[in-house]
Structure formats: structure tokens, C-alpha cells
């Protein structure tokens, strides 16, 4: 890992295998959990919450994307060729995406904007799962002391129009 970060600076083959193994463990759990929930009651919806910062979320051992999304082909240096196989979006009936950007970063196309987080999640889900995106209104820069009611309509618009729904984490 790069000094002072949690990111792999120049990933080796063994590091990529470890990252893929960790994602496989979570994938296999999600696959079994979804099957168990649906075996008890097929009408119960099964889902998950994840942080939308996919570019660094691999450090949590999670690949929340569709297995149709190929992060190695998309240029993520930490992803092995088989990492895509451990995406688990197709095992969920819905997902919540934490679009936890600063209060001043509502609109945009890239990660670290609320709209960008939701747009990028849609690309990574490949239509496998409906999802709601939303902000953390208690922790990121600009939200710590409240007083942001005036920007909530923009936040709702940015997230809900790039996702299938909206939620708020407080």
C-alpha cells in the first residue's frame, strides 16, 4: 500500500489475488444470504448498503458492482482479470449507495460529487439492480453543523435523477 494511504500504489499479482479473494468471500456470502432469504419468503426483498466510492472501496473487500462490469478493463490497476466475477449486484433486489460528498459537491460527473457517485453506480450496476443514492447529512464537509436545508432540493434532484430512488444517511 502507498505510504499513508489505504490504496495499492503499484499492485503486484499477489495483491490483486488477495483483493479478488476478499471480494469473493463477500460475494459468496451475499449469494448464499440472498438465496436463504428468498427460500424463506420469495416476496421479501434482499439488498445492501455500500459506499459509492468504488475506486477505493476494494480496500473494504467488497465488489458491489455487476459481474458484467469489468473494473480491470475500465483501468482500475488494483483489479485482477477475475475480480469482475465477484460483483454481487445481481444477487440483490435493491441497493443503497452512499453518495457522501461535501455539501458543496452536489453536481458533477465523477466520484466525490453526489450526482457523480449515483451516475457512476448506474454504470457499474449494468441494469442488474435498482438503487437509491443519497448523502450523509451529518459528517462530510459542510454538513457537520447542520443548516443545509436550502440545498436539499438540489441534493434530491442530483441523486434521484441519476438513481432510481433517494435516501438520507444522518
Regions found by a protein language model. Give the residues of each.
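Polysaccharide-binding and catalytic clefts of secreted carbohydrate-active enzymes
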Residues: 1-92, 98-103
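Substrate-binding cleft of secreted/luminal carbohydrate-active enzymes
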Residues: 83-170
Amino acid at each position: 500500500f502507498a505510504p499513508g494511504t489505504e490504496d495499492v500504489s503499484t499492485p503486484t499479482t499477489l495483491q490483486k489475488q488477495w483483493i479478488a479473494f476478499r471480494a469473493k468471500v463477500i460475494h459468496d456470502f451475499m449469494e448464499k444470504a440472498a438465496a436463504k432469504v428468498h427460500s424463506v419468503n420469495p416476496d421479501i426483498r434482499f439488498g445492501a448498503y455500500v459506499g459509492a466510492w468504488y475506486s477505493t472501496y476494494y480496500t473494504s473487500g467488497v465488489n458491489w458492482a455487476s459481474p458484467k462490469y469489468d473494473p480491470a478493463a475500465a483501468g482500475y490497476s488494483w483489479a485482477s482479470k477475475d475480480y469482475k466475477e465477484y460483483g454481487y449486484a445481481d444477487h440483490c433486489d435493491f441497493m443503497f449507495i452512499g453518495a457522501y460528498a461535501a455539501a458543496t459537491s452536489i453536481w458533477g460527473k465523477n466520484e466525490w460529487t453526489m450526482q457523480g457517485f449515483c451516475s457512476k453506480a448506474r454504470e457499474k450496476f449494468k441494469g442488474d439492480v435498482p438503487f437509491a443514492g443519497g448523502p450523509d447529512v451529518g459528517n462530510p464537509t459542510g454538513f457537520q453543523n447542520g443548516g443545509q436545508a436550502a440545498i436539499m432540493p438540489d441534493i434530491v434532484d442530483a441523486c434521484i435523477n441519476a438513481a432510481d430512488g433517494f435516501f438520507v444517511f444522518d
